[in-house]
């Protein structure tokens, strides 16, 4: 390593986040920030990439990067194999946290809340707009399970291709969406000298309460 980890840092120099810039509820601000990220972030950064954290039945945390695939006034939607490790963890503990980080904008958004499955129709609607290879992969891959080799996985894909050679694959019952229903959303804007701006929204008694947190 050519540089000490202790010496690795960058200073943040973009504009701050004042209460006057923030609406009373968080979804409008998220939409604004997300639109900024789509316009500003460049590959390899994906604006809709997020880290999803879950906790299993033994209280052990797990995290991974996923893509946000839906957003409305109910919450934030992602899709996966329901039999996967994350699916089993959400079955045992239906709460999760997700984090978006947009480095070019020096912004981060943290979201916490309860998670529920979307309707089968919502899952099928998204499944049908996926590329064919991804739709076949949802059938072929026993996600999170141990497999013998890459060749074994490719064999499963070929078998799935043969199965659906004369028909379009439909959405499997073990695959679909989850929606995180936010109870807390924090907007973080990097500032100089690590004195960052943090505006936190909490869902309290049926409405959003906004507060500033110390950096």
Swiss-Prot record:
Membrane-spanning residues:
none
Q: Which residues form a coiled coil?
A: none
Q: How is the cofactor bound?
A: Binds 1 FMN per subunit.
Write out the catalysed reaction.
pyridoxamine 5'-phosphate + O2 + H2O = pyridoxal 5'-phosphate + H2O2 + NH4(+); pyridoxine 5'-phosphate + O2 = pyridoxal 5'-phosphate + H2O2
Alphabetized UniProt keyword annotations: Flavoprotein, FMN, Oxidoreductase, Pyridoxine biosynthesis
For FMN, which residues are the binding ones? 64-69, 79-80, 86, 108, 143-144, 188, 198
User: Part of which pathway?
Assistant: Cofactor metabolism; pyridoxal 5'-phosphate salvage; pyridoxal 5'-phosphate from pyridoxamine 5'-phosphate: step 1/1; Cofactor metabolism; pyridoxal 5'-phosphate salvage; pyridoxal 5'-phosphate from pyridoxine 5'-phosphate: step 1/1
Q: Does the keyword GTP-binding apply?
A: no
Binding of substrate: at which residues?
A: 9-12, 69, 126, 130, 134, 194-196
Q: Which cofactors go with this protein?
A: FMN
Q: What are this entry's molecular-function GO terms?
A: FMN binding; pyridoxamine phosphate oxidase activity
- Keyword Flavoprotein found: yes
Enzyme Commission numbers on file: 1.4.3.5
* GO BP annotations listed: pyridoxine biosynthetic process
- What top-level branch of life does the organism fall under? Bacteria
For the protein in the UniProt heading, the enzyme class is oxidoreductase
The Swiss-Prot or TrEMBL record describes its family as follows: Belongs to the pyridoxamine 5'-phosphate oxidase family.
Subunit field text: Homodimer.
Family matches, as NCBIfam families: pdxH, PRK05679.1
Function field: Catalyzes the oxidation of either pyridoxine 5'-phosphate (PNP) or pyridoxamine 5'-phosphate (PMP) into pyridoxal 5'-phosphate (PLP).
Q: Which HAMAP family match?
A: PdxH
Name of protein? Pyridoxine/pyridoxamine 5'-phosphate oxidase
Species, as recorded: Pseudomonas putida (strain W619)
Gene symbol of the encoding locus: pdxH
């Amino acid at each position: 390593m050519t540089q000490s980890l202790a010496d690795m840092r960058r200073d943040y120099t973009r504009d701050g986040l004042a209460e006057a810039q923030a609406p009373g509820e968080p979804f409008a601000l998220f939409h604004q920030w997300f639109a900024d990220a789509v316009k500003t972030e460049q590959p390899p950064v994906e604006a809709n990439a997020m880290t999803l954290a879950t906790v299993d039945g033994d209280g052990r945390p797990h995290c991974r990067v996923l893509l946000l695939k839906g957003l409305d006034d109910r919450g934030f939607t992602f899709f996966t194999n329901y039999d996967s490790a994350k699916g089993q963890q959400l079955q045992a503990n239906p709460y999760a946290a997700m984090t978006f980080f947009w480095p070019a904008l020096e912004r981060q958004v943290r979201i916490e809340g309860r998670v529920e499955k979307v309707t089968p129709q919502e899952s099928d609607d998204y499944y049908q707009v996926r590329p064919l290879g991804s739709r076949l992969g949802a059938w072929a891959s026993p996600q999170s399970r141990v497999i013998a080799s890459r060749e074994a996985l490719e064999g499963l894909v070929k078998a799935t291709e043969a199965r659906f050679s004369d028909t379009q694959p439909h959405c499997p019952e073990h695959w679909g969406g989850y929606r995180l229903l936010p109870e807390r959303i924090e907007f973080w804007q990097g500032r100089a000298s690590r004195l960052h701006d943090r505006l936190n929204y909490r869902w309290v008694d049926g409405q959003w309460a906004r507060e500033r947190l110390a950096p």
